[in-house]
Amino acid sequence: MTETTSAKPKKVSKPKAKPTHPPTSVMVMAAIKALKERNGSSLPAIKKYIAANYKVDVVKNAHFIKKALKSLVEKKKLVQTKGAGASGSFKLAAAAKAEKPKAVAKPKKAKTPKKKAAATKKPTGEKKAKTPKKKPAAKKPAAAKPKKAKTPKKKAAPAKKTPVKKVKKTSPKKKAAPKKK
């Protein structure tokens, strides 16, 4: 009797395709670094940079870009010079600039007093800690990726802008010179 019961075949889950771009927060930070604007980079400027340098549909990922900006401001990696929320201008925080040199300096100090074996163990622990953080960030863009098939339609829509009609300037007709009597 166990043979007569039909078992449903298990659905084979397809492995999620890895996104062709880094996490949104990394792209936003790179955009602000590259733009180097004195008063901070605006949201449209950041989107324009991301669209030009990464294979990302900015219209569909606008939500993720805004979310990344807000979270980076909360983490104090960015400073909002103008506006509120995700609008306005953003600069790299002084703390974010100073963190990178400190992070490089700390492992060097740790290696000198300890044995080589202990020093090699530390970087492996750091790598293990970093990998789980990257995976959740990669899942979010992967969920948005299947929607990319629709992008050509949206890109075509802005291209259909109505041409601006050029107004021809008609020069005033010269009046015939009055006949001499």
Curated annotation (Swiss-Prot):
Main location: nucleus
GO BP annotations, alphabetical order: chromosome condensation; negative regulation of DNA recombination; nucleosome assembly
UniProt xrefs under CDD domains: H15
PROSITE patterns linked to this entry: H15 (PS51504)
Record keywords: Chromosome, DNA-binding, Nucleus
Highest taxon of source: Eukaryota
Region called Disordered, residue ranges: 1-23, 81-181
Domain H15: 20-94
InterPro entries: H1/H5, Histone_H1/H5_H15, WH-like_DNA-bd_sf, WH_DNA-bd_sf
Keyword Lipoprotein: no
GO CC annotations, alphabetized: nucleosome; nucleus
Compartments where located: Nucleus; Chromosome
Keyword set includes Ubl conjugation: no
SUPFAM superfamilies, alphabetized: Winged helix' DNA-binding domain
One Pfam family hit: Linker_histone
GO molecular function, one term: nucleosomal DNA binding
Biased composition (Basic residues): 8-19, 103-119, 145-181
Gene3D superfamilies in the cross-refs: Winged helix-like DNA-binding domain superfamily/Winged helix DNA-binding domain
Function per UniProt: Histones H1 are necessary for the condensation of nucleosome chains into higher-order structures.
PANTHER family named in the record: H15 DOMAIN-CONTAINING PROTEIN-RELATED, HISTONE H1
Family statement drawn from the similarity comment of this UniProt entry: Belongs to the histone H1/H5 family.
Name by which UniProt lists this protein: Histone H1
Source organism: Tigriopus californicus
